[in-house]
A protein has these predicted regions:
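A conserved mid-protein helix/loop that constitutes part of the nucleotide-sugar donor-binding site
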Residues: 31, 242-245, 249-268, 282-288
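Aromatic "clamp/platform" in nucleotide-sugar-dependent glycosyltransferases that forms part
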Residues: 326
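Donor nucleotide-sugar binding/catalytic pocket of nucleotide-sugar-dependent glycosyltransferases
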Residues: 176-232, 239
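Nucleotide-activated donor-binding/catalytic signature segment of Leloir-type glycosyltransferases, i.e.
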Residues: 288-306
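Short hydrophobic beta-strand element within catalytic cores of glycosyltransferases
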Residues: 343-346
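Short alpha-helical donor nucleotide-sugar binding micro-motif in glycosyltransferases
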Residues: 305-306, 313-318
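N-terminal subdomain of nucleotide-sugar transferases
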Residues: 1-70
Length: 425
């Protein structure tokens, strides 16, 4: 089968020798694009349209070897010439750029289709429900959309974590999402034409109109390889210190401020504990200041960006993984912690609400600010006092990760969706 994949975000995993640009480009969604394309090409002839910024990383990874299947993929790189680099990290300009990039991608796809005659088109990334795929809306071939997200929002109770400018940014985001869902005809055509709509969390599922709900399939935006799995046995560290780990880009919406405040409440009762934060980003200075103000700077350890294999080693040694991100569509680090047999504490919203279930973790409903802090602290206390519970949740988390998130399993599920899409209606 000849498959056309639109993957605006597609970048190989970062390595120890990677540049700062590689670290920024190889985020969760870009890894999703790279990994799932590797699964699709195992069974099909694949053409991929992606942005030109990805070219260097993709070609370097293919030259290094170890990606033999992906060498069969025909990559096409497109971008607007002369787009200023300074605008890449600007949310507003990126929304406009991505919208018009989709138009470029459609015209390139139409040209390719006249030559190749595709059997199926798949919009893989970016993963949001409110921005249309022009390939999906207008290219005359069966179409798969997703996995998409974007249905999640910042809980009102936690908006006080934002600065005033971040609150304005959040309102801007909600406004453009409303316009996308209610005004853009091309977005409605995507829903109508799609043979399957893959969604990565429950909130996004609920954004799909009732008449198209029969097309919806829950499908994660995070995946695991066999080497990501740690030992199944959960052990306390030899030094007897209860270790809480959290990982991610240091941005306010990731909830690291909540993690520090909840840990401060917990460690007053149980001082033989530490919180380790791995990551870098614009919120680092504020977070370090917060730890000093709460007089726990000696128990909060900050580690800069680390390669994935180093992060997995840290996960293997911790007791609990804490991830109170309050605007998260996916949450790759949650799945990675589960693979390392760690119980996860997170918020009942977005991707974490999908990943974490009572059988293998603890979810906190974001009802009010003080309630969130109190319940996060109580969850830490509960897991600190009950080693058997930690072990039971950790083992269940590892089984869930093996059953649901293993990349080969996701490839099998995607192949089934492809086959169903081509069945006569």
């Amino acid at each position: 089968m000849k498959v056309l994949v639109s993957a605006y975000a597609c970048y190989p995993p970062s390595t120890e020798m990677c540049t700062e640009e590689d670290k920024k480009m190889a985020d969760g969604e870009a890894l999703l694009g790279w990994n799932l394309i590797g699964q699709i090409v195992r069974s099909h002839d694949v053409w991929v349209i992606t942005q030109a910024r990805n070219r260097r990383g993709i070609e370097r990874a293919l030259q290094r070897g170890g990606q033999s299947a992906l060498k069969a993929v025909r990559f096409t790189y497109i971008d607007f010439p002369g787009w200023p680099e300074a605008l890449w990290d600007n949310q507003i300009s990126n929304h406009f750029y991505y919208y018009f990039w989709q138009i470029l991608a459609f015209f390139r796809a139409r040209t390719l289709h006249r030559i190749v005659h595709f059997d199926l088109a798949h919009h893989l990334t970016f993963a949001n429900d409110w921005m249309p795929s022009f390939i999906g809306a207008f290219l005359p071939v069966p179409f798969i959309w997703g996995p998409i997200g974007g249905g999640h929002t910042t809980p009102k109770a936690l908006r006080q974590e934002y600065t005033w400018s971040q609150r304005l940014g959040d309102y801007y985001r909600m406004t453009v999402q409303w316009i996308g869902r209610n005004v853009l005809i091309s977005r409605r055509r995507c829903q109508k034409r799609a043979k399957a709509i893959l969604v990565c969390n429950y909130e996004t599922k609920h954004k799909v109109p009732a008449r198209w709900q029969d097309k919806v399939r829950l499908f994660p935006v995070n995946s695991l390889s066999p080497e990501n799995f740690g030992e199944s046995l959960v052990n306390r560290p030899e030094d007897g210190v209860f270790t809480i780990l959290t990982v991610g880009r240091l941005r306010q919406l990731k909830g690291f401020g909540l993690a520090i405040k909840a840990f401060a409440m917990f460690t007053r009762k149980y001082p033989s504990s530490k919180l380790e934060i791995i990551g870098d980003g614009p919120d680092e200075r504020r977070l370090k200041r917060l730890a000093r103000e709460l007089k726990i700077e000696d128990r909060v350890l900050f580690s800069t960006w680390l390669p994935r294999n180093e992060v997995f080693r840290k996960m293997a040694k911790c007791d609990v993984f804490l991830f109170p991100s309050f605007r998260e569509g996916g949450g790759a680090v949650i799945v990675e912690a589960m693979a390392n047999a760690k119980p996860v504490i997170g918020l009942d919203t977005g991707g974490p609400a999908f990943h974490i279930q009572p059988e293998w973790g603890i979810k906190v409903a974001p009802t009010s600010y003080d309630q969130v802090l109190g319940e996060l602290s109580s969850a830490l206390q509960r897991l600190f006092l009950d080693g058997n519970l930690r072990h039971r949740l950790g083992e269940a988390a590892r089984r869930r990760a093996m059953d649901y998130y293993l990349l080969d399993r996701l490839g099998e599920r995607l192949e089934k969706i492809y086959r169903e899409a081509l069945l006569p209606t």
